[in-house]
């Protein structure tokens, strides 16, 4: 019997199965040395639609610009705010993939008749309908992503997003932590954020749905910031002196708002060191993206072949970076303790 048990044990080892019969996990993607050696305070996290879509995949408005406009249009139709001909016109534009910024602008204008007071418009109602009850729609794997972002924030990383939602702020509140949502209408706060005086604030460069009057779809919408040389100088210094880490962003660097804020006045971009985490996906597309981004000083890194690989990869990266930030100037023993603490904190919050 003992021999049979031993043989079974050997077979189990050969097959690589654990005691519960589960198959072995695939080998995790290695962390890039030039990224994992960063400290949190050296990073600016850029959160794109891919993160929101991963956190609450059942909300179509979080997945893309087109999804958001369609959701706003559906809400407007449900509230009987558009004539039949108007709704057909907007649907046709969406179906034909017309300039989405222009479509969104026209829809907002239609929902904001003859007034600049957003409180008296229907646009606000439609926004709140689209983003209603986001807390209940977050999935656990998405919460793990948000916990990693929050952990880096608390250790000194800055965070900006192109998204209109406040998923990160909602998650933080659920953890008993208060984050502030900023938009480009408040120059003073934007300046303080860029100067690292408001580290627990999230800068929404397109605005956030809880403040409809701060939503901008085009650089013309925040000329106050673009004309403020002090604010722009501080913002551009971030791109020159820190490492931006793009999460769920894809082609965010082609976004006109992002370009106006960070790229247009920055010279020698290829000498900088920024990072973009993306799914490996199509080999040719991945190669093309990597080549294009290098000219902008951005290293494109694959976190895996599947979207589901991102939470675990980013968790490992966060633990590594947080350890280095916490143990700067501390003996090696302190580094090991810090690593254990970082893993423990993230694990505790994500359960």
Swiss-Prot record:
<dbReference type="Pfam" id="PF13289">
    <property type="entry name" value="SIR2_2"/>
</dbReference>
<protein>
    <recommendedName>
        <fullName>Protein FAM118B</fullName>
    </recommendedName>
</protein>
<dbReference type="InterPro" id="IPR038916">
    <property type="entry name" value="FAM118"/>
</dbReference>
<comment type="similarity">
    <text>Belongs to the FAM118 family.</text>
</comment>
<feature type="modified residue" description="N-acetylalanine">
    <location>
        <position position="2"/>
    </location>
</feature>
<comment type="function">
    <text>May play a role in Cajal bodies formation.</text>
</comment>
<keyword id="KW-0007">Acetylation</keyword>
<feature type="modified residue" description="Phosphoserine">
    <location>
        <position position="9"/>
    </location>
</feature>
<keyword id="KW-0539">Nucleus</keyword>
<keyword id="KW-0597">Phosphoprotein</keyword>
<dbReference type="GO" id="GO:0015030">
    <property type="term" value="C:Cajal body"/>
</dbReference>
């Amino acid at each position: 019997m003992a021999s049979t048990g031993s043989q079974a044990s050997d077979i189990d080892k050969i097959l690589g199965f654990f005691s519960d019969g589960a198959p072995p996990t695939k080998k995790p993607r290695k962390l890039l040395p030039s990224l994992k050696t960063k400290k949190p305070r050296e990073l600016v996290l850029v959160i794109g639609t891919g993160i929101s879509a991963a956190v609450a995949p059942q909300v179509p408005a979080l997945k893309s610009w087109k999804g958001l406009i369609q959701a706003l249009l559906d809400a407007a139709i449900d509230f009987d705010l558009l004539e039949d001909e108007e709704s057909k016109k907007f649907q046709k534009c969406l179906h034909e993939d017309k300039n989405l910024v222009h479509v969104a602008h026209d829809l907002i204008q239609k929902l904001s008749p003859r007034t600049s007071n957003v409180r008296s418009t229907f646009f606000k109602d439609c926004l709140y309908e689209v983003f209603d009850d986001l807390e209940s729609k977050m999935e656990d794997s998405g919460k793990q992503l948000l916990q990693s972002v929050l952990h880096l924030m608390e250790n000194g990383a800055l965070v900006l997003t192109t998204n209109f939602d406040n998923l990160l702020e909602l998650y933080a509140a659920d953890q008993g932590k208060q984050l502030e949502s900023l938009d480009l209408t408040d120059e003073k706060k934007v300046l303080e954020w860029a100067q690292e005086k408001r580290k627990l604030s999230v800068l929404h460069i397109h605005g956030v749905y809880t403040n409809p009057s701060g939503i901008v779809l085009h650089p013309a919408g925040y000329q106050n910031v673009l004309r403020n040389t002090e604010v722009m100088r501080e913002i551009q210094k971030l791109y020159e002196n820190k490492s931006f880490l793009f999460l769920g962003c894809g082609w965010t660097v082609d976004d006109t708002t992002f370009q106006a804020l960070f790229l247009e006045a920055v010279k020698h971009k290829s000498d900088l060191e920024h990072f973009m985490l993306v799914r490996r996906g199509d080999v040719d597309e991945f190669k093309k993206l990597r080549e294009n981004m290098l000219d902008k000083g951005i290293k494109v890194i694959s976190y895996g072949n599947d979207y589901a690989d991102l939470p675990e990869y980013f968790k490992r990266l966060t633990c590594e970076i947080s350890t280095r930030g916490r143990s700067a100037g501390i003996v090696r023993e302190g580094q090991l303790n810090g690593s254990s603490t970082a893993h423990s904190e993230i694990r505790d919050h994500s359960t």
